[in-house]
Amino acid sequence: METWQELKVTVKREGEELVSNLLIELGAQGVAIEDSMDYVGNVDRFGEIFPEVEQQEEIVVTAYYPETVDVAAVEADLQARLAELTDFMDLGEVKMGTTALTEEDWADNWKKYYEPARITHDLTIVPSWTDYEATAGEKIIKLDPGMAFGTGTHPTTKMSLFALEQVLRGGETVLDVGTGSGVLSIASSLLGAKEIFAYDLDDVAVRVAQENIELNTGMENIHVAAGDLLKGVEIEADVIVANILADILIHLIDDAYRLVKDEGYLIMSGIIKDKWDMVRQSAESAGFFLETHMVQGEWNTCVFKKTKDISGVIGG
């Protein structure tokens, strides 16, 4: 029986998606998240209340590697990459540890962390292996969380989904910048967008997004390609959405203003509290007006509008 290696990385909650993505880039065959916030105050869809769980600042990202991988080298590489990012994000004290698993352990271990999750009024994210029956009006997004790049339950992704639900009415063209898992593109299609163009700089993310899109039926209107933000893009859009780090977001704002149609929207997420003013000022300097601002914990998500009628915007 084949042996697998389990690498556990403990970081502050803000580092969940960053660490998950890096572990996948470093060859992980699956990633699981342990977060006490997933259970605090939760009630499942059948009304059962989860046991009391003490809220922790830290989460555990667990990655799974074949026995042929030098996990010590992965640890060293991950530590080096995280050290380069300390100016952009407070990860706290990073702790790592490894355990050997059998094939059977691996097959069951990471899947136990994922259950169907109702994210917004309309949208529910369902692991690809789950037999789930939707209720009336419920829109299902099937994802393979083992591929990482965003499982849809991180605050930045949740708020992005709420924002899309707010602005999409049907028939729109959407640009999804830094698509990751493809979850925002899939949601846009389910919410009625006519065409979605998804971009990511990471070739692995492009592949993962395409595979997740193929898990969902009727997604032929989503086009995925490698791309560096919006450089070289000439497609006019009704909505542009980007869930990436604030220091990267500010570099796409001018191109977003160029491409978004009049009365169109720019949704930005992935913004920690200390970077919010910087992002807001950059967007307003480009000509956008803030329409909606959402906050969950340390994270900010915003909906900016390109409009001459500022009566309905914040500060208008």
Swiss-Prot record:
It comes from the Bacteria. Its main location: cytoplasm. GO terms for cellular component: cytoplasm. Signal peptide: none annotated. GO terms for biological process: methylation. Keywords: Cytoplasm, Methyltransferase, S-adenosyl-L-methionine, Transferase. It is found in: Cytoplasm. The keyword Cytoplasm applies. One of its GO terms (molecular function) is protein-lysine N-methyltransferase activity. It catalyses: L-lysyl-[protein] + 3 S-adenosyl-L-methionine = N(6),N(6),N(6)-trimethyl-L-lysyl-[protein] + 3 S-adenosyl-L-homocysteine + 3 H(+). InterPro entries: Ribosomal_L11_MeTrfase_PrmA, Ribosomal_PrmA_MeTrfase, SAM-dependent_MTases_sf. The keyword Transferase applies. It is an enzyme of class 2 (transferase). S-adenosyl-L-methionine binds at T157, G178, D200, N243. Its EC number is 2.1.1.-. Pfam families: PrmA. HAMAP family: Methyltr_PrmA. Belongs to the methyltransferase superfamily. PrmA family. Methylates ribosomal protein L11. This is Ribosomal protein L11 methyltransferase. It comes from Streptococcus pneumoniae (strain Taiwan19F-14).
